[in-house]
Curated annotation (Swiss-Prot):
Annotated protein name in UniProt: Glycine cleavage system H protein
Residues covered by the Lipoyl-binding domain: 24-106
GO BP annotation list: glycine decarboxylation via glycine cleavage system
Natural source organism: Gloeobacter violaceus (strain ATCC 29082 / PCC 7421)
InterPro entries in the cross-refs: 2-oxoA_DH_lipoyl-BS, Biotin_lipoyl, GCV_H, GCV_H/Fam206, GCV_H_sub, Single_hybrid_motif
Gene Ontology cellular-component annotations: cytosol; glycine cleavage complex
Top-rank taxon, per record: Bacteria
Gene assigned in the entry: gcvH
A Pfam family the protein falls into: GCV_H
Family that this chain belongs to: Belongs to the GcvH family.
Length: 129
């Protein structure tokens, strides 16, 4: 898969992306993370209605190479979990920015939550040098 970094998204050092939709944010893993992990075979995510706090583990992603904890990039309430990706984790690898998203979160405080993100160009420079 080609490494892509859609311009409309925000990116984090943890190789997660954020798609901001008002006070709701879609969280997923970047194509760079997918490339590093290899074939994804299992994902564990929180339940709808769970509260997540920035920096805390909210799940894990398992590939043929490793098991990685997923750390919350922001604080808020989980509005939706991508159950299709839970049932078919390979979807995260084949379409990370589309059908392979992980969770949707309502931000606890939108003004405070999005300050530590990078643009697509900044992220590309970070991971590709």
């Amino acid at each position: 898969m080609a490494l892509e970094y859609p311009e409309e998204l925000k990116y984090l050092d943890s190789h997660e992306y954020l798609r901001v939709e008002g006070d709701t944010v879609v969280v997923g893993v970047t194509s760079y993370a997918v490339d590093q992990l290899g074939d994804i075979v299992f994902v564990s995510l929180p339940e709808e209605g769970d509260r997540i706090n920035r920096g805390d583990s909210f799940g894990s992603i398992e590939s043929v190479k490793a098991v990685e904890e997923l750390y919350a990039p922001l604080s808020g309430t989980v509005l939706s979990v991508n159950t299709v990706a839970v049932e078919d984790p390979a979807l995260i690898g084949s379409d990370p920015y589309g059908d392979g998203w992980l969770i949707k979160v309502r931000l606890a405080d939108p003004a405070d939550e999005l300050g530590e993100t990078m643009t697509a160009e900044e992220y590309r420079e970070r991971v590709e040098g």
